[in-house]
Structures are given as structure tokens and as C-alpha cells.
């Protein structure tokens, strides 16, 4: 399993922007798209904010589901609990929004079909 060091990817100890999150996302999406497991290493990272984790992790749900995520993405064992909370918040937010969107789209398609029947 390959390890991706966040500090090396973003060039900083501060994971504090969506642009930096996108840098990590681009690596992770390539791995998960090829069904390659990866460990994300937050060693030496001092700060993580939701805009970073939303882009780096939440956006992955455009291409994989939660089961695949759990199978493919791991974190360094000593990851900061606050960082993990931030990641989990982004995952929950992303999956919930996608479920709501899917339900709304299904409802809209059903209404269109009923109107055309």
C-alpha cells in the first residue's frame, strides 16, 4: 500500500485551503480510480480545516462510494483526532448531500414521467 505524505503534497504544514485540498484529491482520485489502496499520512501537519478536507476527501464521492472509500483509504495510525473529526465531517457532509441530490433528481424525473404519461 502506497503512503501519500500530505506535507510533501501540499508543500506546507498547514492544510488550510481548498486549493491545497485539491492537490491531495488529484493524487487520491487517481489511486481510488485504479482501485489502489493508499495511506494518507498527516505527519508534521499542524492545522487542517474543512475547506481542505472537503476538497481532498469529500470530492472523492464523485467517483467512489462509502464502502469503496473505507476499503481504499487509510490514515497514519497517530493521526490527530481533530484532523480525523474534520475528515469525517467532510465525508458525512458529502455523502448526505449526494443522497439528497439523488433523491431530489429521482423525484423530479418521476414528476416529468407522470406529466408525460
Where are these regions (language model features)?
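Acidic, metal-coordinating catalytic cores used for nucleic-acid/nucleotide bond scission
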Residues: 44-52
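Generic recognition of short, well-ordered alpha-helical segments
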Residues: 19, 51-55
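STAS-like cytosolic regulatory interaction modules
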Residues: 1-39, 46, 59-117
Amino acid at each position: 500500500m502506497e503512503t501519500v505524505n500530505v506535507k510533501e503534497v501540499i508543500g506546507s504544514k498547514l492544510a488550510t485551503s481548498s486549493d491545497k485540498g485539491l492537490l491531495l484529491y488529484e493524487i487520491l482520485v487517481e489511486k481510488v480510480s485504479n482501485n489502489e489502496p493508499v495511506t494518507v499520512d498527516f505527519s508534521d501537519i499542524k492545522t487542517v480545516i474543512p475547506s481542505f478536507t472537503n476538497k481532498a476527501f469529500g470530492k472523492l464521492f464523485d467517483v467512489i462510494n462509502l464502502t469503496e472509500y473505507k476499503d481504499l483509504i487509510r490514515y497514519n495510525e497517530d493521526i490527530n483526532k481533530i484532523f480525523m473529526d474534520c475528515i469525517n465531517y467532510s465525508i458525512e457532509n458529502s455523502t448526505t448531500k449526494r443522497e439528497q441530490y439523488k433523491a431530489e433528481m429521482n423525484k423530479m424525473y418521476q414528476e416529468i414521467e407522470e406529466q408525460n404519461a
